[in-house]
Amino acid sequence: MKNLISIVGKILALILTLAYSPGTSLAYAATDLVVIVNPASGVEKMSRDEVTAIFMGRAKRLPSGITALPIDQTANGGDKAKFYGELINKELAEVNSYWARLIFSGQGSPPRQADNAAEVIEIVSGNKGAIGYVPRNSADKRVKIILDLSSQ
């Protein structure tokens, strides 16, 4: 009986490890990222290319014409690496290198930083031109989802 319990425990541990390992759909299902804006921004939807242009400093306005205020997250929580990986298929080191070159050459400055999803929502809900990204389950009625990164 002890042997059976031990075997069942090991199998369960293996299943959980595999199910929640990076790269599996179960691991990321709870953290699907969405791009959000202020509901008063006049933006209904945006493409990946439009969002990329704003977060990489190539576009300065939202499709509605309002000056864009992109809100990035610090690298601490993992959402930032996931966002850039899903949006432009780049590692965070590559994105940081890109911004270092632009800053050094005086051609741009990176998006404003927020510590976590709650802070992103606070900033976006209080600024008409703000755009950010959060896990789907963090988005609430104070913001509008304009792009679901998991569905494209």
Locate each region found by the language model.
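Exported/periplasmic ABC-transporter solute-binding proteins
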Residues: 28-152
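C-terminal segment of classical bacterial N-terminal signal peptides
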Residues: 15-26
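N-terminal secretory signal peptides that target proteins for export/translocation
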Residues: 1-7
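Classic N-terminal secretory signal peptides
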Residues: 7-17
